[in-house]
Each structure stands twice: as structure tokens, then as C-alpha cells.
């Protein structure tokens, strides 16, 4: 990895699949979609600390209620951004040598009002960079971005049989 790289686009959603006014068949479901990034550190000697800069121009990213998690050892640890503005939200993660971590960014579905409103739609792109560009500036990393989503049926509060999707994203390196 160079000191900084664009990885992929992202789209975070809590939205109806079909707009209610157009749902003449009554098939409308709500999708909750998050962004998942697997990061493998292929280096045998050193951990790498990265900054993940999520950039969104048309939507105020800091005004959206989001959750971020980092998982290397089976514990989804809640992350807070190290920087947040209207157009950027930056997280910092460390991947041990020869290990893989999973970063998750999703709408805050722990807040029922977010799911009930079904009005979250945030798009942008991710730029990764070394947290400290001094010292070793060349790391062999494997980045695998994807979207994962859950479809909630109508009346989801009483009938929790959902379907899920997983889609790999094109990445730039």
C-alpha cells in the first residue's frame, strides 16, 4: 500500500426498496445496508495502523447516526471516529502482522427511530492512509470491501424473518 489509497465507494441505507407510493403490489420491504472492509496485513514482522477516511459530499456524514466496529479476535469493538466533519469521518484501526481484521460501518439500527423512519441514505468513498507516514511506508495489505444488507419484511417488529445480501465491491489499489 502506498501512503494513501482510494479503496472503494460505499452506500449506507435504511430505506424502503420500493417507494411507498409505487408499492402497488404491497411487496415493499426495508433494507438495512452496511459497509464491510476486511483488511489483511501480509507483513510478517510489523503491525500496521491505518486511518479510514469515509468521505461523503452531498450528505452530511456527521449528521447521520452511524455505528463503526473493528474486529480482529472475534470481538466487535465499538469505534469512535478520531475526526468528524460534515464531509469526513475518520477511524483508526491496527492490524497485527499476518492477521486480518474486519471493519464495519453501518446506520445505527440500535435506535428504533432510525429503522422506523427508513430514511437513511449515505453514499461516498473510502480513502485509507497510514496513521504515521514516517518509518516504513510500504506495507503489503489485502483490502476486500463489500456491502451487506438485511431486508426487513413489513411488520418486522412482529415477524422477524429477514433475508440478507452480500455484494463484493470493486476496489482501487
Descriptions of predicted regions:
Residues 27, 33, 38-61:
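Asparagine-centered strand-capping/turn motif at beta-strand->loop junctions
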Residues 2-38, 156-173:
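Beta-sheet-dominated interaction scaffolds and their linkers
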Residues 28, 41-43, 84, 117-119:
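Sterically constrained small-residue positions within well-ordered secondary structures
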Residues 39, 50-52, 93-95, 126-128:
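Hydrophobic beta-strand residues in large extracellular and virion-surface proteins
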Residues 1-15, 47-56, 62-68, 98:
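Conserved long hydrophobic alpha-helices within structured protein cores
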Residues 58-116:
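Intrinsically disordered, low-complexity Pro/Gly/Ser/Thr-rich segments with frequent PxxP/GP/PP motifs
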Residues 97, 102-172:
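Terminal connector regions
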Amino acid at each position: 500500500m502506498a501512503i494513501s489509497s482510494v479503496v472503494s465507494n460505499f452506500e449506507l441505507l435504511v430505506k424502503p426498496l420500493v417507494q411507498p407510493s409505487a408499492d402497488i403490489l404491497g411487496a415493499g420491504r426495508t433494507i438495512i445496508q452496511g459497509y464491510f472492509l476486511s483488511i489483511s496485513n501480509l507483513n510478517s514482522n510489523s503491525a500496521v495502523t491505518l486511518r479510514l477516511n469515509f468521505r461523503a459530499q452531498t450528505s452530511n456524514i456527521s449528521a447521520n447516526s452511524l455505528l463503526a466496529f473493528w474486529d480482529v479476535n472475534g470481538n466487535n469493538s465499538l469505534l469512535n471516529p478520531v475526526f468528524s466533519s460534515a464531509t469526513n469521518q475518520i477511524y483508526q484501526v491496527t492490524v497485527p502482522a499476518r492477521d486480518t481484521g474486519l471493519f464495519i460501518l453501518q446506520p445505527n439500527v440500535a435506535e428504533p427511530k432510525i429503522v422506523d423512519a427508513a430514511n437513511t441514505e449515505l453514499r461516498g468513498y473510502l480513502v485509507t492512509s497510514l496513521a504515521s507516514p514516517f518509518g516504513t511506508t510500504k506495507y503489503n495489505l489485502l483490502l476486500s470491501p463489500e456491502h451487506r444488507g438485511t431486508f426487513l419484511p413489513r411488520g418486522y417488529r412482529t415477524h422477524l424473518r429477514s433475508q440478507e445480501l452480500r455484494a463484493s465491491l470493486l476496489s482501487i489499489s
